[in-house]
Amino acid sequence: MKYELDKTSGNARRGRLVFERPQGTFSVETPAFMPVGTYGTVKGMTPEEVRATGAEILLGNTFHLWLRPGQEIMRKHGDLHDFMQWHRPILTDSGGFQVFSLGKLRKITEEGVKFQNPINGERIFLSPEKSMEIQYDLGSDIVMIFDECTPYPATFDYAKKSMEMSLRWAKRSHDRFDELGNKNALFGIIQGGVFEELRKVSLEGLVNIGFDGYAVGGLAVGEPKEDMHRILEYICPQIPADKPRYLMGVGKPEDLVEGVRRGIDMFDCVMPTRNARNGHLFVTDGIVKIRNAKYRDDTSPLDPECDCYTCKNYTKAYLYHLDKCGEILGARLNTIHNLRYYQRLMAEIRQAIEDDRFDDFVVEFYARMGKPVPPLQLADNS
């Protein structure tokens, strides 16, 4: 993988990731949003439908794909690309966040994490080395190191110990990645909770090891939005400018805008797909809750400014009807729209950076939403 930085507008960065795959050279224009395909599928969508929304890269889930279908079946198909028939780039998370989510079902040690398989109750073990081996079998174009996702709230001492162990795991991940002869990209993950000095130590340690990109982890786990913004403003300027920056698990449309304002290049989140299945649809001026009875006889398109298949062909009344009847097509049409909304938003962001009018775009974006523009502070990184 190669990262090319073309232009900046304030802190916002316009570039691309370039991948050499067996099928040819693929570019991912950044800032980019990655739809989440937890089990090797973006829920309800074929790969062709996902691509039609504008997506150029997907996220797969190492933890869940390891439990089902497992490495052996993946190897029989070739890799995850062959298994799910998506031959463009794939990023896989390491499984660290899913293990964190297990709560009392898991025990963290220096060696790794012992936990109870949520599917069959078996006791199993996941380590940095094992995560690298699973992601190697998945054929991930971007591999994430195995880390501990520091919970919120956490004391300074807990966050420090967690971050230090994640650094040791980062080195073990890097060593095993190299031993496997993996020619793809490996990203480090910056931890440290809401404590700036810990984030700085984490980043410095990761840079000393050397990675192809750097993710900001451990945010969007319950901390106030102001803390997320503060950490991003503090740490992003310190990340090497020639490496991509990835904010993990974020988020709402305004979170994407705020991340780009602070220098982030890559995002992923289940929000557009999960919200679609729950009837929450993103439109130019906010959200349409399609289950609201006021849409029962609304013959207008969901979003007149949207060019997706759903908006070009169907009315709000039809989407309301499908949802009311529990029809699978309703969830699919909603998902097509929400994914396209996110990709259109990213395309608008990229164009605004190219035109060096990103600050104006931010003002216009919040004006459409009827919301004030959040403050942007200049962090003191001395």
From Swiss-Prot:
| Pfam families the UniProt entry points to | TGT
Q: Name one GO molecular function term.
A: tRNA-guanosine(34) queuine transglycosylase activity
Region of interest (RNA binding), residue spans: 249-255, 273-277
Give the cofactor note: Binds 1 zinc ion per subunit.
Q: Which residues bind Zn(2+)?
A: 306, 308, 311, 337
Which amino acid positions bind substrate, per UniProt? 93-97, 147, 191, 218
Keyword hit for Cell membrane: no
- Provide the top EC class: transferase
Q: Please state the span of the N-terminal signal peptide per the UniProt entry.
A: none
EC number(s) on file: 2.4.2.29
Q: Note whether Nucleotidyltransferase occurs among the keywords.
A: no
Q: Which UniProt keywords apply?
A: Glycosyltransferase, Metal-binding, Queuosine biosynthesis, Transferase, tRNA processing, Zinc
Q: Can you state which reaction this protein catalyses?
A: 7-aminomethyl-7-carbaguanine + guanosine(34) in tRNA = 7-aminomethyl-7-carbaguanosine(34) in tRNA + guanine
- Recorded metabolic or biological pathway in which this protein acts: tRNA modification; tRNA-queuosine biosynthesis
GO terms under cellular component: cytosol
Q: Which GO terms describe its biological process?
A: queuosine biosynthetic process; tRNA wobble guanine modification; tRNA-guanine transglycosylation
The residues forming a coiled coil are none
Q: According to its UniProt record, which cofactors does this protein need?
A: Zn(2+)
Name the residues annotated as catalytic in the UniProt entry.
93 (proton acceptor), 268 (nucleophile)
**Family annotation (Gene3D superfamilies):** Queuine tRNA-ribosyltransferase-like (3.20.20.105)
Quaternary arrangement and interactors, per the entry? Homodimer. Within each dimer, one monomer is responsible for RNA recognition and catalysis, while the other monomer binds to the replacement base PreQ1.
Q: Which family does it belong to?
A: Belongs to the queuine tRNA-ribosyltransferase family.
Q: What does this protein do?
A: Catalyzes the base-exchange of a guanine (G) residue with the queuine precursor 7-aminomethyl-7-deazaguanine (PreQ1) at position 34 (anticodon wobble position) in tRNAs with GU(N) anticodons (tRNA-Asp, -Asn, -His and -Tyr). Catalysis occurs through a double-displacement mechanism. The nucleophile active site attacks the C1' of nucleotide 34 to detach the guanine base from the RNA, forming a covalent enzyme-RNA intermediate. The proton acceptor active site deprotonates the incoming PreQ1, allowing a nucleophilic attack on the C1' of the ribose to form the product.
Protein's recorded name: Queuine tRNA-ribosyltransferase
This chain's source organism reads Haemophilus influenzae (strain 86-028NP)
